[in-house]
Every structure is written in C-alpha cells, then in structure tokens.
Amino acid sequence: MKYSALLFTLFATLNTSAWAVDLTKVHQGDVLPVMLAELKPTQPSVGYDQIYYKLGRYQQDAEKQFDEICEANGQKGVSHFDAQSQPAIATSFECKEPVGAERKDMKTVVIAPNSQLYLTDGHHTFNTFWHMEGGGSEFPVNVLVDKDYRELKTMDAFWKQLDLDKNTWLFDASDQPISYQQLPTTLGMENFADDPYRSLMYFARDVSWDKPAQPVPFLEFYWAKQLKPQLPLAPFDLNTEQGYLNAIEAASKLILAEQSNDIGGSGLSAKAMGQFDHFDAKKFKKLSKQNSKLSYMLGYKTAQQ
C-alpha cells in the first residue's frame, strides 16, 4: 500500500527527529534514516558543474533520478516507478533491494562528540537531492555510520582526529588551508564555493582516470589540487561545449603525464590514484554526443544564467 505524501512526510519527520534527539542506540556500521538538513558538511567546496549535470539529467530522465535515489539508499537501483512517483515518497516507487543491502554504494557519516552527524562522503549527491525538483532540506535519505567519535571530549579533538583520518577536506577552492569553523554548516549549493577543477576531474573520469578499487577520501580534490598550478582555466570558455571539451582534454593530458608519487599531498602515486595508461578517445568523443554529461550540464547551467 502506498502512503500519501502527507503521511510519509510526517513519518520521516518523526523518525529523523527521534534520531536527532537520541543516538544512544546507534553504532558504527548502522544504517540511519535522516533528513538532509541534519547532515553537517566536512568540505568547503563542490564542483557546481557536476551537480548541474545531475540536475539537468534528472529534469529529462526520471528513471536516472529514481535509480540514483535507490542507489544512495543502498538499494542497487530502481525497479519500478510511474508518473505518480515522487522522489521524497519512498512508497511511490520500488527499488531492486531493501534499504542498506548495497552498503558500498551508500553515503557515509560520522557521529561527533556533540551528537551531530557529519557527512564524510556524498556532498555532490546530497546537494543534488537538495536542489532537485521534489528534493529540499527535508528530503529523506539513509546513510551509513562510518565512525563514532563520541568518546572524544571536545570538538577540537574531533576535528583533529577527523583530519588525521582523512575524513575532512580543510582547504578552500584556492587550496588555502581553512579551519573547521569556516566550513558550511548545512548542505545547499549556496553554502559551498565552486571548485571548477573538481568538476573537470568528474568529466575527465573514464577518459584519463578512474577510481581505484579502494579510493582515498577526497580523491578528486587531491587531483584538482595537483592540476591547478599547471592548468589555468582562463583560456577556456566553460560555458560552451567546445571550451569544456578543450579543458577536459588539457586536464587529461596532464593527468596522463603525471609522474608524482604524492598527488596533491595525498602520499599516493598517480597510478594509485587511478591514472590510465592512455587517453580513451572513445569515452572522450562520447562527451560531445547528444544527451551526454556535458550537454545536460551546459543546458541546465545556461538556464540558470
């Protein structure tokens, strides 16, 4: 039986409010239902163009939208939806697996000494859910509790340990160090700086690099940090397809030529960070086709200007 939108919203509100008040029964490895507004960021910037791609894609491809909602909830993908299905109403569509079945696909949080939930993976996905039609601050998601830091006495100690665990990115979009007090306090793109190099890494994926089996957290940011001194973006018009393709090609050539054993300060080599042996011309050409990632992104981006 399908719940009405009002009933589901009431259920989600009660459910997540309960978690916000009492986390005593929650442990590392648990799957936790929350609203997006309950999640605190651990990075100051995102790649706007990656989010624009998703938003543009969802506007024209409802199956992709529901598929990624299911995936984020650890449910593999969507198995059924119809014209009446609504993103925030889980009973209005069906996923392939129960919640939490595919935990490797879920976004992760940690519990801080102040009993707040800090998002350590999924800033792009959840900002997309925040801004998409049918999304918003009260959009319900399930997250995986990666670590519990409540035994630490202070928030200063928490952030120090989070940094040691490489579960936070304390650099601004110009790669200048920041304090944790300078981080956004909530999701929503307007609270994040735009890092165009982070977007370039997203679109160059499968062309010159791919995520290794066990990627280091913030892998794309490390690569972006490595590229910035070598690749000024002023010569590229990132509002046009050709300009963006030129930038992706230039970034990919630098990635393929990179021989550093410390990409962006990660302590890892280019190969360990997913560097390809050669330029994938077929995947690059795909970016210029109709209904490509670039076409969806540029269409949405242009409409916002």
Cite the ranges covered by each PLM segment.
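Surface-exposed, charge/polar-rich loops and edge strands
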Residues: 22-100, 104-109, 113-116, 124, ...
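Active-site-adjacent beta-strand anchor residues
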Residues: 119
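Gram-negative bacterial Sec-dependent N-terminal signal peptides
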Residues: 1-19
